[in-house]
Amino acid sequence: MRLGYLADFSEKEVKFAKKTGFAALEINCNNKKANFWKVVSRKNGIESIKEKMEENGLIISALGFYFNQIQPEDWQKKGFLKLLDIAPKLNVKTICTFTGRDPEKSVEDNIPLFKKVFTPLLKKAEDKGIKIAIENCPMMCGHPFRGINIAFAPKIWDLMFEAVNAKNIGLEFDPSHLYWLGIDYIQALKDYRDKIFHVHAKDTEILEERLHNESIYGNGWWRYRLPGLGEIDWQKFIATLYDIDYQGDIAIEHEDPVFSGKKRAEGLALGYKHLSLWILEENKK
């Protein structure tokens, strides 16, 4: 269980990760102009990424490409297929993404669309030894609630897994979303132990005054924080990961507004310091 964080690839990022004590990076491929895409398009670019990571004692825990798979932009669709080819060359076995959603349809009516998109993707991934991990973020887009990712609750996970019936689809488990949705994230860890392929470490702070003013149907009554600065019980969470014999890695997903901009590095170091309390020393490398 190695500790890393989500970021675009760069030499500066790799050096910072090593200096701070991280053992891994989840490479963020979301942006069309991400440095990762520039590097892999060059001759020997993939090898240069591998070499830079190895020189600094780091591994790539996963590749993250989060978009609406059901209604993708053309570059996203093509980019995801490229990742299926790139991942094995980087010795990466997990690609993380969203399911996507037609926001005008119910969750149940999106399941056939999910099946149509993911059945061939999962077959291609299986042929290359790749697992696809779906992050459990609702990606809310206003009210009434629509969102662009249906995979936000255990009931829906069951519908998804039943629809495609593939061993290489699972979850990128993020407790921060489950917390404000009112779902027991510890019980969910236990219930879906065989389907957790990657973990995002992100905390949640409930802003009680705003919640009481706007109700649960309002916006902005919670905010995401670095691990240790919100209300997630990280000691219990990581203890449960050990209890269920989780074999993957953990990546901090930094969306903390207090430590944004120039304070980003300070925030990541703070998150590392907190989570390191609960991770066995031999598993940090």
Label the model's feature ranges:
Residues 26, 62-64, 96, 133, ...:
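Conserved beta-strand positions in the central sheet of alpha/beta enzyme cores
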Residues 13, 49, 83, 121, ...:
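Aromatic/hydrophobic pocket-lining residues that form π-stacking "cages" and hydrophobic walls in ligand
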Residues 1-10, 66-77, 108:
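Active-site mouth loops of central-metabolism enzymes
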Residues 33-42, 142-151, 262:
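Short, flexible/disordered intra-domain loops and linkers
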Residues 9-11, 29-31, 66-69, 99-103, ...:
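Active-site-proximal loop/turn and secondary-structure-junction residues that shape catalytic pockets
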Residues 18-19, 52-55, 71-170, 180, ...:
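Active-site acidic/histidine proton-transfer and metal-coordination neighborhood
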Residues 26-50, 102-105:
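Glycine-rich, proline-tolerant flexible connector loops at the mouths of alpha/beta enzymes
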Residues 1-24, 54-57, 91-92, 144-145, ...:
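Histidine-acidic metal/acid-base catalytic patches
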